[in-house]
Structure formats: C-alpha cells, structure tokens
Amino acid sequence: MIGTIRIFLVVAAMVALSLSLIPFQYLFLKLKNGWKRRLPNFFHRIVARLFGFRIRTVGKLHEGCPLLLVSNHTSWSDIVVLSAVGQVSFIAKSEVRDWPVFGMFAVLQRTVFVERARRGKTVHQTSEIANRLIAGDAMVLFAEGTTSDGNRVLPFKTALFGAAHAAIREAGVAEVAVQPVAIAYTRVHGMAMGRYFRPLVSWPGDVELMPHLKGILREGAIDVEVRFGEPVFVTAETDRKALARTMENRVRALLQSALLGREIPEA
C-alpha cells in the first residue's frame, strides 16, 4: 500500500514539474539560450530526489576543451543520474526518439540519435556528434551499446569514438578530452545491494520499461555513486580502437572501485 501511494505521489509531482518546465525548454531551444543546457540539469536534480536517488560523486567533469564522456550503462535511470550531476547531452539509439514521453524528453535534452546497425551512416553520425562537441556540449556515449547487469562492463563498441577525431579534423581544435565515467548502484534503503539485488535497478532490453520504472519508484532510497576518471586527451594521431580499449579498462576499474569500496587503479 505504501509503495502504491509513493508511486502516485511521485508521478503526480513529475507531471506537475514537467508541465511547468517543458514550455521553457522549448523556448530556450528556439532562442538558442544558454539555459537549454542548464534547465535539463535543474529538472533532473529534482527528478533524482523524487525517485529517491542519493547520488555521490567522486571526481568531476573535465572543463576547458571539447568533452566526450564515456560511461557504462545499466539502466534508463543512468540518464537521470548523469543529468543531475552535470550539464550533459546523450548519444542514444534512434529507437529512443519514438518512445512515448521518454522520446520527447530525449529530444528536449538535444540527444543525438544514432543507428548503430547502419555502418554506412557512421561518418555522418560521428560528424554530428563532433559538431556538438565543438559547440561546447558535453556528450555522453554509452559505449557498450546496450545495458548490463550493473555488476560488470561489457565490451565497448569503437565506431563512435571517431567523433573525437572528427571534431579535431572539422574544427581544427588541438585536442578533445575523452573522460571515463562509471555509474554504480550500491545500496537500497542503506543496505548493500550486492550482485543478487542489483537487478532491481538494472534494465536489460527484454524487460518492459513501465514495470521496471514502477519497481524503482516503489522502492526509493537508492544510493548511486558516479566516478569520473582522468581524461585522455585525443589528438589527430590517437588510435580510435586503442582509445576505446583504454576507456573500457578505465570504466571497468572505476565501476569495480565503487562496487567494492576500495580503489582499483585505472589502466
């Protein structure tokens, strides 16, 4: 009963919040105002509180040059968590654009939609991401290309790492920062999740979204740790596949450090 009441209250608050802020975001996008980056961050900080996410950050977003963030991917909730931590936009599969409600939010946050299966579009897609990097947008790449169980990092796809090189090539910038990020769901109601309970938040592709969303809303009080690693500064000479391997190893080390509660050196 308590869980049902909590879901109702959170949904009601979300509807009120969304109806209040969505018109402003449309306006900021039309005017190309700087608040087009700030408002999603503000919105998701409130959403994270409503959902019961208690976020702890280790390290910080790199500043000073074009930034591509490379993260592990456990659940749809990663979007809320990272958006609450910083002013970021995402790189997502094209299907997300057509999802009810969530697709609209993705568009409002200026997500770049990609078709991973169509290799012929890779050059165009990396160029689009590069243009956003050049414009000063911190872009998040979930390089696994799918969601994991939250206990491990899956092998990284390498194609979209080419966006860093495209930014250098097209804008003549000297370097692009590529920064590893790990999102770890560690506790629920103060109790360590462990491997057995982490599927509470992990969202594999064969699970329907709405039942999973209700499960998280019913629980609340979920501790999340976001770890930012040291960036790699990419130049025109940097090998794309070697960069992807480095990021995969670093994200894996950051995730294990958060889950185990002890530092594991980045590769």
Curated annotation (Swiss-Prot):
It is a single-pass membrane protein. One of its GO terms (biological process) is lipid metabolic process. Pathway: Lipid metabolism. Its EC number is 2.3.1.270. Disruption phenotype: Deletion mutant lacks ornithine lipids but synthesizes a component corresponding to the lyso-ornithine lipid precursor. It does not affect resistance to bactericidal peptides or permeability of the outer membrane. The chain crosses the membrane at residues 7-27. The keyword Membrane applies. GO terms for molecular function: acyltransferase activity. It is found in: Membrane. Signal peptide: none annotated. GO terms for cellular component: membrane. It catalyses: a lyso-ornithine lipid + a fatty acyl-[ACP] = an N(2)-[(3R)-3-(acyloxy)acyl]-L-ornithine lipid + holo-[ACP]. SMART domains: PlsC (SM00563). Pfam families: Acyltransferase. It comes from the Bacteria. Keywords: Acyltransferase, Lipid biosynthesis, Lipid metabolism, Membrane, Transferase, Transmembrane, Transmembrane helix. Belongs to the 1-acyl-sn-glycerol-3-phosphate acyltransferase family. OlsA subfamily. Catalyzes the second step in the formation of ornithine lipids, which are phosphorus-free membrane lipids. Uses acyl-acyl carrier protein (acyl-AcpP) as an acyl donor and converts lyso-ornithine lipid (LOL) into ornithine lipid (OL). PANTHER family: LYSOPHOSPHATIDYLCHOLINE ACYLTRANSFERASE, PHOSPHOLIPID ACYLTRANSFERASE. This is Lyso-ornithine lipid O-acyltransferase.
